[in-house]
Amino acid sequence: MSKRQSSVQIRQLFGPALRSRISPASSELETLSPPRLSPRDPLGDMYPEESRGSGGVAAVDFLEGTYDYAAPNPATTPLYSQSSTGYYSAPLETNGPPSEGSLQSLGSGPTSPLVFVPSSPRLSPFMHPPSHHYLETTSTPVYRSSHQGASREDQCGSREDTCSLGELGAGAGAGGFEMAKDTRFCAVCSDYASGYHYGVWSCEGCKAFFKRSIQGHNDYMCPATNQCTIDRNRRKSCQACRLRKCYEVGMMKGGVRKDRIRILRRDKRRTGVGDGDKVVKGQEHKTVHYDGRKRSSTGGGGGGGGGRLSVTSIPPEQVLLLLQGAEPPILCSRQKLSRPYTEVTMMTLLTSMADKELVHMIAWAKKLPGFLQLSLHDQVLLLESSWLEVLMIGLIWRSIHCPGKLIFAQDLILDRNEGDCVEGMTEIFDMLLATASRFRVLKLKPEEFVCLKAIILLNSGAFSFCTGTMEPLHNSAAVQSMLDTITDALIHYISQSGYLAQEQARRQAQLLLLLSHIRHMSNKGMEHLYSMKCKNKVPLYDLLLEMLDAHRLHHPVRAPQSLSQVDRDPPSTSSGGGGIAPGSISASRGRIESPSRGPFAPSVLQYGGSRPDCTPALQD
């Protein structure tokens, strides 16, 4: 009997445990065996072939040894298939993986695509006796990554030959691994979120609570100090604090994910029948046409295209939805400064937050109906004239449900006494708190707030021609048309709120009168910020610095450059060719010169794509 036959018998009798003791014989076997397969050979050559007989017995040839095992009835579930089961080959020894040459193509005929998964110690090797053969089920965890998927695609030759977790079944390990990445928590109580409700991820309980609260006139009162802890176990203990936290995290009526809006529009276009659906489809057609015209604008500074598109054709309901969808998120300061604050730390916190909010404010303005159709000069002028008013009304709205508190960010909530550390800050805090109290008394609605915020921006350039140092708007008629559209949307919403005719007119006047108080606060805040800049007590960021200097230095030198030269906004925010982009304010003015930056220094908004704290928030 040859050495080769004797070695095969030894392996069958004693198993792979003795392989390390017969290494000389193994070296001779390698010289007698067929040539090793290349790693680049097709995947089918790396696996044993199947020959299924009619008698219900399948044979697998491996290393010139034949092992029979019972095959199931063809009428039942197949023994293995492309999408349910895969072979898992084990090493010939328990101390290391098998070599690539130890697997050979035995037999002929077509082979089902199999996925090669490295074996683990709990898998039985093929070299065991026939009773020890196993076919692993799909409950074995298979973790796929983009790199692994690409390599398998290269081996199999097509994407259809690769296995996916969905095809392999709902395995416990794989399912848990995939779901772990997609697990979201309620922004209000930190319970598991059931979906995206009213603008934030929330659970079913908080969604239903917020729905009940905004539908009725619920005047909740906190029995304590309006600072109750709202979590999974204590969310029902205080309705007032729960509703306050809902507003703090950004819940609002009509808050819908943008991708959901697109899905709803598509479904309506597909299934809409009847007169009512035809009207809705007609309105959607106008909106799509409007968006298409907005995206087709070229980089000529907007071209003053207000006359090319009538914004008044958009219905009031659609205007309200656009305004609510344009709202920026609530930011985090991410500043680790200990209390009590000093003058320097307080101003550092506030200026840092203002600089972050300015970037989001520009993205918000670009989403307003008709704003991108204005010339670049008009866009810059409106933003420079109203930026602090817009930031202040946003601060007041966030603080409306927190008496005595100003919510600058989710992790930066200040009260009146904390403003004492900065000279002149207490007066500004008092005015902000008084206006927030007025908002609370009027029970300002989210729809009314977004309209007032847009009116502040568009009304800021109405009297620019009165100043000798400021160039007037190039297309004041287009700005006035946008302002009328927003005002009509506000009047329409008030008329649908159930007020009597006289009460409607009174409420319109009450809301619009608030804007004069906000303008007064803005002027006070601008003077205070400019005095702090002159004292060099706190460094100002480039964007905030240029916005501040825009109120002091207004001497136009050259016409706005084309947007193609100055648009460096992130791809997600460059939705229109005529919009404000990083660097556009300085480029359009050509006049910002301050003690901290020369005339040729990097301009105002050039951080749009490079600042990590703002890039995620600007994505659509």
Curated annotation (Swiss-Prot):
Record localization: Nucleus
InterPro entries: Est_rcpt/est-rel_rcp, Estr_rcpt, Estr_rcpt_N, NHR-like_dom_sf, Nucl_hrmn_rcpt_lig-bd, Nuclear_hormone_rcpt_NR3, Nuclear_hrmn_rcpt, Znf_hrmn_rcpt
Domain free text: Composed of three domains: a modulating N-terminal domain, a DNA-binding domain and a C-terminal ligand-binding domain.
Protein's UniProt keywords contain Zinc-finger: yes
Span of zinc fingers (NR C4-type): 186-206, 222-246
Region spans: Disordered: 1-55, 88-111, 286-308, 558-620
Entry's family note: Belongs to the nuclear hormone receptor family. NR3 subfamily.
Protein name as catalogued: Estrogen receptor
Quaternary assembly: Binds DNA as a homodimer. Can form a heterodimer with ER-beta.
Pfam families: Hormone_recep, Oest_recep, zf-C4
Hinge: annotated segments: 252-314
Highest classification ranks of the organism: Eukaryota, Metazoa, Chordata, Craniata, Vertebrata
Biased composition (Polar residues): 1-10, 101-111
Single Gene Ontology BP annotation: regulation of transcription by RNA polymerase II
PROSITE patterns attached to this UniProt entry: NR_LBD (PS51843), NUCLEAR_REC_DBD_1 (PS00031), NUCLEAR_REC_DBD_2 (PS51030)
GO MF annotation, one: steroid binding
Compositionally biased region (Gly residues): 298-308
Entry function: The steroid hormones and their receptors are involved in the regulation of eukaryotic gene expression and affect cellular proliferation and differentiation in target tissues.
Gene Ontology CC annotation, any one: nucleus
